[in-house]
Amino acid sequence: MSRIGKKPVAIPAGVNVTIEGNVVTVKGPKGQLSRELHKDIIVTVEGNTVQVTRPSDDKFHRSLHGLSRTLVANMVDGVSVGFSKSLELVGVGYRAAKQGKKLVLTVGYSHPVEIEPGEGLEVEVPAPTKIIVKGIDKEKVGALAANIRAVREPEPYKGKGIKYETEVIRRKVGKTGGKKGKK
């Protein structure tokens, strides 16, 4: 058995899980998510837990087992608690602002960069150098945070750019100035 796949997913109070064929739908206080899982994976609701099982010990089924369980667990967490990712802007004059729903980044280009968060996503700017992406779908939250970071990735010499709050930038030593090679 998969170590992750065999663990049951606890359903908190206020969350409802329904299964129709191979489509799992999770409703909770923050919203609703549904996802189609592979046809071979068996998902059952037993009391206040969701159990994910596989039909055989094939390598393919083993790999899907843990994945499917984690996807269901992320759906349950998303509709009950939600997910968030924090980003920081490092650099002189680098700042973020919110215009309506859009996020406007000033990060050293000749023009401000506008990013529209997708449906079900929310962007907060508590400070000009801090961005928080929130939502119920972990995949979408991570993808939007990665897209924001990709606008100006941190460079290794001064560390300027947009980075995740917990990310540590590996620094490089710059060239040493001097009269190397001069006669």
UniProtKB/Swiss-Prot annotation:
Q: Name one GO molecular function term.
A: rRNA binding
In terms of Pfam families, this protein maps to:
Ribosomal_L6 (PF00347)
Which keywords does this chain's UniProt record carry? Ribonucleoprotein, Ribosomal protein, RNA-binding, rRNA-binding
The protein's matches in PROSITE patterns, at most eight in alphabetical order, are given as: RIBOSOMAL_L6_1 (PS00525)
Q: Which GO terms describe its cellular component?
A: cytosolic large ribosomal subunit
The record's similarity note reads: Belongs to the universal ribosomal protein uL6 family.
This protein's assembly is summarised as: Part of the 50S ribosomal subunit.
Q: What's the protein called, per UniProt?
A: Large ribosomal subunit protein uL6
* UniProt source species: Heliobacterium modesticaldum (strain ATCC 51547 / Ice1)
Q: Which gene encodes it?
A: rplF
